[in-house]
Amino acid sequence: MKSLRLVALFCCLLPLGMAHASRIKDISSVEGVRSNQLIGYGLVVGLPGTGEKSNAFTEQTFRTMLNNFGIKVPDNIKPKIKDVAPVAIHADLPPFAKPGQTIDVTVSAIGEAKSLRGGTLLQSFLKGLDGRVYAVAQGSLVVGGLGAEGADGSKVVINTPTVGRIANGATVEREVPNSFSQGDTITFNLNRPDFTTARRLADVVNDLVGPNTAQALDATSVKVYAPRDPGQRVSYLATIENLEVDPASEAAKIIVNSRTGTIVIGSQVRLKPAAISHGGLTVTIAENQQVSQPNPLSGGQTAVTNNSTINVQQEQGRMFKLDTGATLDDLVRAVNQVGVAPGDLMAILEALQQAGAIEGQLVIL
């Protein structure tokens, strides 16, 4: 119940933090200014016997790498590759990244390697969705996990030793074109779509620059006219994105995670009049085995019988009443007085939703 009170207190205080205005750059993004995902395949070498077991796929990759270095491995020789591991590499290419700049990469084992700790990623290409190479990755891995295994099969694993990271491990080789400097307009897309917030954003821009400069297209997008000159457009956008907007109040929602028992109730939730009674039913089944011994010299056999005892205990349900316009605070206070556990509160909320007593949306994760 302490956790339930904590969640309720946090939700009650949340609107106080949102009462002040937010910068446009904090609640929206510029259309076309986005990161791009890169992916690649490579080999990590230098592992202390924790690499890949011998298989045709890894062996072929290893032979291809040596061939690229001008080393021909005879077909009748099977290389030992316990210190090598095939890996998948992925990274995010930031917007406006230029050739020569570096980005972080994440390296993950894709075979049977036990750990990448102490390994070094050899030069690997990172490609975009179009199949073109945008960066080249190489470097020593930093692995936060640790794994150890004994000769008897016992092992200890801490965190994830098969995933590592290389800070500034990839060099950008190609710039991704974008449409930022094209056209007469810039479009801001709200992180959380809302018609009221979109209108307010357009009003703030129009108040500063002039009427009809900004127009809300829908609940997400706001179109703003901007200079064509790249230098002027950057200065213009720097001014616009630092303007402050009062975001609209969030829609009334109750979020329930049935797997973890977490319940978050928004402060905008209102309840219609309702009377609620919730009682618990406990069923206990006990199994006892009884042994029956035959009389001496009777020729009988020992018999084992099961004796089951079933006990049903029903807790006395208490009823509480919610008046018109009851708020989050009223609901939490009522369930705390009754002693409802978070698991039971989920059932109560679902029942209230079915009865039409919740003025808001119930979202079950």
From Swiss-Prot:
GO terms for cellular component: bacterial-type flagellum basal body, distal rod, P ring; outer membrane-bounded periplasmic space. Belongs to the FlgI family. NCBIfam families: PRK05303.1. Pfam families: FlgI. The basal body constitutes a major portion of the flagellar organelle and consists of four rings (L,P,S, and M) mounted on a central rod. This is Flagellar P-ring protein. It is found in: Periplasm; Bacterial flagellum basal body. InterPro entries: Flag_FlgI. The gene is flgI. Residues 1-21 form the signal peptide.
